[in-house]
Amino acid sequence: PSVNARPCSSPLVCPAKGEKFFGVGSTSRIRRLPPHLAWCSIDWEQLCLLNLLGSGGFGSVYKATYHGATVAVKQVNRCSKNHLASRQSFWAELNVVRLDHNNVVRIVAASTCTPASQDSLGTIIMEYAGNCTLHHVIYGTGYLTGNSNDDLKCDHGFLSTAQAIIYSCDIVAGLMFLHSQLIVHLDLKPANIF
């Protein structure tokens, strides 16, 4: 949900003329996170997707468990209409990995490699912020899905003035922090605020 103010946050470097893109003598694609992100590699055997929370132009977000904790998993589509934009979006989102703020979702782990069964450009595991978005609160909708037996119930009624002020202050605090780090949120909308 955030983009670094620099033009491209991808660690990819274009090769010089005559060099192979993935290194001399290498015929297989080896994709790794940059060294400063190596600590957050995904342990795939510990990840269990539970249900789809939402999807958009660049990918899908799932509720999942990772090492026993409830998390949100964002998978960026490989076959998106704009592959370069998808890749830049993935790497830009990882720019928040170093940030620590109460109003910014933390990244737990990430990977550019995925199991063969998944057709994704990359996967980001984030802290789980809950089932209910600001969109649900504003419009008083009770569920993310139509099934009232799901655990996706949003327990809020309509948004009061006091709640609106609290939400507004939290949103502004998070945005001010991101802006102080030269990061701009490019998809700010009630459905993306938990």
From Swiss-Prot:
Active site: D187 (proton acceptor)
GO molecular function, one term: protein serine/threonine kinase activity
Chemical reaction(s) catalysed: L-seryl-[protein] + ATP = O-phospho-L-seryl-[protein] + ADP + H(+); L-threonyl-[protein] + ATP = O-phospho-L-threonyl-[protein] + ADP + H(+)
Keywords: ATP-binding, Kinase, Nucleotide-binding, Serine/threonine-protein kinase, Transferase
Chain ranges of the Protein kinase domain: 47-194
Residues annotated as binding ATP: L53, G54, S55, G56, G57, F58, G59, S60, V61, K74
SMART domains documented for this protein: S_TKc (SM00220)
Coiled coil region boundaries: none
The enzyme's E.C. designation: 2.7.11.1
Any matching Pfam family: Pkinase
InterPro entries to which the protein is assigned, alphabetical: Kinase-like_dom_sf, Prot_kinase_dom, Protein_kinase_ATP_BS, Ser/Thr_Kinases-Pseudokinases
Enzyme class at the top of the EC tree: transferase
Domain of life from the UniProt record: Eukaryota
Family of this protein: Belongs to the protein kinase superfamily. Ser/Thr protein kinase family.
Protein name (Swiss-Prot/TrEMBL): Serine/threonine-protein kinase mos
Organism: Dendroaspis angusticeps (Eastern green mamba)
